[in-house]
Amino acid sequence: MKKFSEIKLQVISILSEIRPEYDFSQDLNFIEEGMLDSLDMVTLVAGLDEKYSISIDGDDIIPENFSSLDLVVNLLKKKGVKI
């Protein structure tokens, strides 16, 4: 089982590859701040699917699941990633 903080760091790493100009470790709303758009969310999903061997459905690709680091980690937990 991975620690919550370790998962957060891995998600930050994936996000930083997608949008290196932003600091995703901040407690901000990524969507409202313009840090992620819909294409970025799809790219993030592909990275998360590959990293954690999970499948995030299209129905889950909504701003409510990707607007903060904690929400992304919670989605991973719902998809079966052991945290």
Where are these regions (language model features)?
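Thiotemplate assembly-line natural product biosynthesis machinery
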Residues: 1-23, 74-83
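AMP-binding/adenylate-forming catalytic domain of the ANL superfamily
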Residues: 60-71
